[in-house]
Amino acid sequence: HSMLQRLKTLALKSANGTYDQSDRETLNMEKDHILEEIDRIGSTTKFGEISLFSRADANTNTNTQGWQPPVLDDTIPLQIGGSAQAGEVLDVERYYIGSKELQLDQTDFSDVKKGQESVGYIENAIEAVSKVRASFGAAYMHLDHTHNNLSVTSENMQAAESQIRDTNMAE
């Protein structure tokens, strides 16, 4: 979010009309560096060996409605339990997070009007990234809840086993 917030700050500076062409070129240079970093993060972020936000052979839905993050054509299956039974796998949607898919390649700070238009693209990208973060957050909470339940179950089983052993010793 911080990079997107910085982009928004740059767009607002561009949209206010007080900057000359040299200043706007500097704003555009910083924007380009931020977009390169967003693309780098999107293409290199991994969980183990699983690429979270990109895959060369994935088909992406790039027909977004502004704020909707492009969904990759597959999910990340996360096994929840100790066995591979059906129902014990959590499928987490994958998203591509890149400047093109977030429509940040449409931003331009070269004049006031383009700067104003860029604010909208950046706000849409912020909303899209928030939705992706919420999706991963929900998956994390699901896994955390499952982990806590399994820990309680394990503790209860150990307590029951201990009680049975104590009973057998007393006999």
Language-model region placement:
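Amphipathic alpha-helical coiled-coil/heptad-repeat segments
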Residues: 1-142, 163-166
